[in-house]
Amino acid sequence: MKERMYVDFHVLQTVPPSCVNRDDMGQPKTATYGGTTRARVSSQSWKYAIRERFMEIFPKEQVGIRTRRLIDLIAGYIREDNPEIDEKEAAKRAQTVLEAVGFKFKSKNEEENPDDDEKKTDKKSRKKTENDNTPNANAVFFISKAQAMAIAKMAAFHSGTTYSKEEKQDCVKALQENPSIDIALFGRMLAGNSDLKTDASVQVAHAISTHAVNNEYDDFTAVDDYTKDDNTGAGHMGTAAYNSCTMYRFASLNVTDLNRILQGTDTAEVVREFAEAFICSMPTGKQNSFASATLPDVVYITIRKDRPVNLCGAFEKAIKPSENGNAEPSANALKQYAKNLYEDYDAPEKAITVGRGMEEIAEKMSFHKLLDTLEKAVSNAIAGKGDGFEEAV
C-alpha cells in the first residue's frame, strides 16, 4: 500500500440494566469525564468479546492462544509428533527453548499463596495447581498455533540444555512468522525479548456513557424449594449492582500496518470480520441475570489517510435526559461535533453509516452492505485502486 489507511469505527449503543464489566468490588466500572460519572466498559473486556467471536468466524488455527502455560502448550505439540519423548522430557525441552528466547518462569512454589478467601472459594483450582509442577511464564503471552508448532519442532530435536546464538535467532524467527489474526490486530509483547513484540494494528477505546450515570442496586432473594413448611425465610439474600446507559464506543484500525503484519492473508476479509465482530460483539458479564445483549443504535465508519480521530469530545458535556431518551440526542451531538471538527480540520476521505442520525455526513446503508462496502474499499486500496468506495457503493 502506498498511502496510510485508517478505518475509524464510531458506535452508539444503548444497554438496558446490566453489569457487563465489573470492578474488584463487583460494581459496574465507571469513569469521570466532563466532571460527571459515566458508565464504562474496558477495552480489554470488549477485545476479549471480539476474540471470542473470532473463534466462530475464523478457522481455529487462525486465532491465537493467550496463556502462561507455554511449557504445557509446547510440550503437547512436541509429543504430538514425537510420542517416544515422555512428558517430563518434553516439558524440559519446551522450557529450555522458551528460556533461550527470553521467557522467564515461576515454579509453583514461587507463585503467590492464595489468601484466606481464595482458599475457601477456589479449592478445586488450587488442587489442580498443587498436582501440576510445570512452571508458568511470568506473564501471559500471545502465540499462534503455527508459531507454537514451529518452536515445538525445533525443541523436539534439541536435547541439550543450551542454544547457540544462531539457534536462538532461528527460534525467534519461528515466533515472529505466521502470526494469528488476533495477534496482528491486538499486538503482543515480551519483556525479555523486544524482537518478539508485535505492535497492534487496532486501537480500542474504553466505552463510556454519553450521559451521567449512577449505579443502582438490586436486593434479591433466592427461595429454598426444599425446606420445612414452617420456614418461610429466603434461602439466600444478596445485592447486585447495575446501571443502564447509551455508550459511545470507538476503535481505529491501521490497515497499512495490518496488511504488513499479515503477510499474504486476505487483509480486506480480516478488516470486514473485525468490523462485524467489533460492532456485534458484547461482553458476557452477568448476561444470564440481565439478558442485556443489544445491537448498536448507530454505526459510523470513516476512512482517513492522516490519523485516527476519536469523537468522544461530543460527549464531554454530558447528554441531558429528555423525553427522547439518550440515543437520539447522542446521535445528534455526535453528528454536530463531527461537522464542527471537519470544518476546523480535515474531513475523512469517505464515511458510511448504519442506523439513524448520521445521514447528513455519511452515506446510510444496511449493515451487510456496509460490510461489503468496507471490504471492497480496503481490497481496492491495497491493490492501488484508490479508496474503492466509488466501485463498492
Which positions does each model-derived feature cover?
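Basic polyanion-binding and macromolecular-assembly surfaces
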Residues: 1-40, 44-393
